[in-house]
Swiss-Prot record:
Belongs to the ClpS family. SUPFAM superfamilies: ClpS-like (SSF54736). Residues 9-32 are annotated as: Disordered. Gene3D superfamilies: 3.30.1390.10. InterPro entries: ClpS, ClpS_core, Ribosomal_bL12_C/ClpS-like. This is ATP-dependent Clp protease adapter protein ClpS. Involved in the modulation of the specificity of the ClpAP-mediated ATP-dependent protein degradation. Pfam families: ClpS. It comes from the Bacteria. Binds to the N-terminal domain of the chaperone ClpA. GO terms for biological process: protein catabolic process; proteolysis.
Length: 120
């Protein structure tokens, strides 16, 4: 029974039934929309005069998965230049990371500020 159905389908594809409107004989395939990469956002830490450097290193290790050496380097950039990029992510992830850092800083009673900026 199954083989018979396959043969019929093949036959019907070669010769459309009378009720099908296929008079042009042209095969049409719908085009797929072009996919674009989502816009990326930088997560930026800002310097302040009160947050301890060790706390900034802890934040970078905890929320951005950095090792101690890289976290210390980024912390020193924040300290000397006033700001540093911690990572570049899609908008939802960047917003979540910035919110988590700001919430953790407030819970720890530090004024550390983390924001996002559109990359590019």
């Amino acid at each position: 029974m199954h083989a018979s159905s396959q043969i019929r389908l093949t036959f019907n594809q070669d010769h459309p039934a009378e009720h099908e409107d296929d008079s042009s004989g042209i095969a049409v395939q719908e085009s797929k929309p072009a996919l674009q990469a989502p816009p990326m956002y930088k997560v930026v830490l800002f310097n302040d005069d009160y947050t301890p450097m060790d706390f900034v290193v802890e934040v970078l290790e905890t929320f951005f998965g950095m090792n101690r050496e890289l976290a210390t380097k980024i912390m020193l950039t924040v300290h000397t230049e006033g700001r540093a990029v911690c990572g570049v992510y899609t908008r939802d992830i960047a917003e979540t990371k910035a919110m988590q850092v700001n919430q953790y800083a407030r819970e720890s009673q530090h004024p550390l500020l983390c924001e996002i900026e559109k990359d590019g």
